[in-house]
Amino acid sequence: MKISGTIITLNAEKYILRAVESLKLISDEVIVLDSDSTDSTRKIAESAGAKVYIQSFLGDGPQKKEASKYASNDWIFSLDADECLDKDLIDYVNSIKHFDNRHDSFAFRRKNFCGDEWIKAAGFYPDYVTRLYDKTKVNYDPRVDHAAVHGKKTIKAKVHIIHNTYESMEEWIEKMNYRSSLSARQLFINGVKPSNVRPVVRAVSYTHLRAHETVLD
């Protein structure tokens, strides 16, 4: 199994070096698809050995699928710029490379952090995400926010991706409000009446808030 690592970026200079170096430990190549960053993201990625391409942002799912098109290999490990691989995941992926795999994808546990705090409550752990997949069989769905890979034969491995989800409480609240608005818009597109949208959005916000309160305990 040869693997191409992919990362989509936009002004990710703070974390991109860590992400690229992390993927290099399991991948034969690293692809960075950048959305017109105005900082040093592309320069840092290229210096670290990544192949860098530019594509105006198409939305989360379409952008990640587009990144896979630049990959030389069928097997893709998709990593977000603010993520890195834990040692247990690196060891696991390197151990399965030499086996004939009949599955189309692998899902991994994700450790989400707010600052230095590991968020475990409100569904934030184990937070399985499918990131290693055979692009000839499956790929990212077309959602513009929080897209996912839906494999038909997925192995759920108990190893970890590290995710620096939020830098601070302020960033958490800002993103919570943004995603609540996205949820309402998507429900409206799907035909849900505004009167029915409000309780759902409140529920989404409450879930994020409860997890936030747990971090502060």
Where are these regions (language model features)?
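Glycine-rich, basic loop-to-helix element that forms the pyrophosphate-binding segment
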Residues: 56-71
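Short aromatic/hydrophobic "clamp" motif used to bind/position activated sugar donors
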Residues: 76
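Acidic helix N-cap motif at the loop->helix transition within catalytic regions
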Residues: 17, 39-48, 88
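N-proximal low-complexity "stem/linker" segments adjacent to membrane-targeting elements
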Residues: 1-21
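A conserved acidic beta->alpha catalytic loop
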Residues: 22, 34-42, 80
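Conserved donor NDP-sugar-binding/catalytic core segment of glycosyltransferases
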Residues: 88-120
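Catalytic donor/gating beta->alpha subdomain of glycosyltransferases that bind UDP-sugars
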Residues: 136-195
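Single conserved hydrophobic/aromatic residue that forms the stacking wall/gate
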Residues: 208-217
